[in-house]
């Protein structure tokens, strides 16, 4: 999934540039973060099957801590991307909405309560992607 922006970038621009790498890094970090969070609920199963997931290696709490670091780094990459591309203030509003949504994700799911993990995984990540994409697109017209 993180390589999809690279394909679009190269198709449109015909080059591999630093902003494209930062965009791909942001997406990879974002995906890795929510995968760590979602996968933490499988700690017992992963352990019983001899899998080497983050939850097995670091516990559910550790997987959540890693997820937080990845989400913060992801938002930093999206912010840096906006600066590199000279996007307008509206793009940064989208990044702010994304950051707030990711913060909210971490506030409603914990290593001991996965009851809302599906809501986080599908609905909240959809909000992040739509907010950043829509605001990036609109920033070209404002």
PLM features per residue range, with description:
Residues 1-142:
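Multi-pass alpha-helical membrane architecture of UbiA-family
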């Amino acid at each position: 999934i993180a390589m999809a922006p690279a394909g679009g970038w190269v198709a449109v621009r015909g080059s591999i540039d630093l902003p494209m790498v930062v965009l791909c890094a942001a997406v990879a970090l974002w995906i890795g973060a929510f995968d760590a969070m979602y996968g933490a609920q499988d700690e017992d199963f992963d352990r019983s099957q001899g899998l080497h997931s983050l939850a097995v290696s670091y516990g559910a709490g550790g997987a959540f801590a890693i997820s937080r670091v990845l989400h913060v780094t992801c938002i930093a990459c999206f912010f840096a991307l906006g600066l590199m591309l000279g996007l307008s203030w509206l793009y940064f509003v989208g990044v702010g909405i994304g950051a707030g949504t990711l913060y909210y994700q971490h506030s409603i799911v914990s290593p001991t309560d996965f009851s809302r993990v599906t809501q986080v995984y599908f609905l909240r990540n959809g909000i992040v992607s739509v907010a950043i994409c829509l605001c990036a697109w609109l920033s070209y017209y404002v």
